[in-house]
Structures are given as C-alpha cells and as structure tokens.
C-alpha cells in the first residue's frame, strides 16, 4: 500500500484498502478559517442543533487568516462568528487575530504549532490543506 493507503487504512480500522474503496476515517484534525468557518458553523448548528457540542475540542483548529485586516465590517463579522463559536465550544485552538495567540497563515502556522503530525488525517475548509501531506500526513481540503 502507498503511505496514503496505510494512513487511511489505519484511521478506518481496516487492515487493507485499495483505490475505489469507500471508507469512514477518524479525523486527526479539522481546520477552518474566516472564509469557510462561519458557513460551516451554520451547517453544524442546522444539522446537529443549536446546543450541539463538537466531538473533540482538541481536534479542531480555527485560524482566521484571509480577511482579518480589513475595514470591511462584514469581514469582521466572520471573525466574530468564529470567536463566538470557539468560546461556546470551549475550543483551545482558536488563534484570535490581534491577540498574542495569533500566528499568521494557517498552512504555515499549523505545523509550527504542532497540529500536523505524520500519519494523521487532516481535513480543512481550504484547498491548500493538502500541503501538509509534505509532512507525512494525509491532508485534504473539504
């Protein structure tokens, strides 16, 4: 098996997988930012209920990095939505712009902060999420 197949097999509990197989995998880490995060949060609440809780607070990283330094108040609403969700869910990995915890572009910051580990699965709401495959993870945008 390829490294991708090995990672996906392990994360799905299968001994062996092949191209074309349909599998369910355990997510090692989920990423979102200020572009897709608010919509994702809306879907989360719509599908699971207003009082729903995330499955594992340690596996969710929210890092706004697209519209953070702009005069557009609508763009600021996106970060406000992320901030409120992180507080509501008690997410430890919300990197808030303008605070000491902020760390820049998500795809650079994730490995620097230890959120990317070889052999894990990473799903992010950004097409560049796949760059973390260079560090030995299975990583893709959704």
For each of these PLM feature ranges, what is it?
Residues 1-142:
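Fe-S-dependent hydro-lyases/dehydratases of central metabolism
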């Amino acid at each position: 098996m390829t490294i991708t197949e090995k990672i996906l097999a392990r994360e799905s509990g299968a001994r062996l997988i092949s191209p074309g197989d349909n599998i369910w995998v355990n997510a090692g880490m989920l990423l979102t930012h200020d572009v897709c995060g608010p919509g994702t949060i809306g879907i989360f609440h719509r599908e699971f209920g207003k009082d729903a809780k995330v499955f594992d607070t340690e596996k969710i990283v929210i890092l706004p990095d697209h519209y953070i330094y702009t005069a557009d108040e609508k763009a600021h609403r996106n970060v406000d939505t992320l901030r409120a969700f992180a507080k509501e869910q008690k997410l430890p990995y919300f990197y808030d712009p303008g605070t000491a915890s902020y760390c820049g572009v998500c795809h650079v910051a994730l490995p620097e902060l230890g959120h990317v580990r070889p052999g894990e699965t990473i799903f992010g709401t950004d097409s560049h999420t796949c760059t973390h495959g260079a560090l030995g993870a299975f990583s893709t945008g959704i």
